[in-house]
């Protein structure tokens, strides 16, 4: 489930976008007002929080119809989360317990055990989709807002920063500063 759940949610986001952008209309028989209800399909936006933000970050690499994205409480780089997250359990301590890793051995994003965990989930980690966040190469890039809480215990803000920096606009911004 961990390797496919977020990818399936990204596909569901794309399918929902297709439904919304292909003349979403409520006919007068189904309308509570008795008149047809039409929606503007020119500017469709996405808001995803937590797991919705993670699946949205994946969908953003493929969906060409959504012009504005808000990814709230989402992050990339599971290795960061494994080392930083303490709620509901201290994942670093859990790893140490199951692997009998001594307290004297430092765990970091580059430790072989953490790298193995990261490799296992790379296919569904949003940080790997962030460089492709502009699928409309010929059109203007979508507007993207990534938010995180400084004290978010589920999604450490370092993971949101890592995901945002992996995006294409961050690279353009950084190269213009150098």
Q: Where are these predicted regions, by residue range?
A:
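The feature captures the conserved acid-bearing segment of alpha/beta-hydrolase catalytic domains
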Residues: 74-178
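Primarily recognizes the serine-hydrolase "nucleophile elbow" in alpha/beta-hydrolase
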Residues: 22-84
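Cap/lid segment of the alpha/beta-hydrolase catalytic domain
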Residues: 1-23, 28-32
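Hydrophobic alpha-helical scaffolding
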Residues: 3-6, 10, 49, 59, ...
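Residue-level detector of short, conserved catalytic/binding motifs and their immediate flanks
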Residues: 11, 44, 49, 67, ...
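Extracytoplasmic/secreted proteins, especially bacterial periplasmic and envelope-associated proteins
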Residues: 8, 12-15, 54-55, 158-162
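Generic recognition of flexible, low-complexity loop/linker segments
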Residues: 2-5, 32-35, 54-60, 126-136
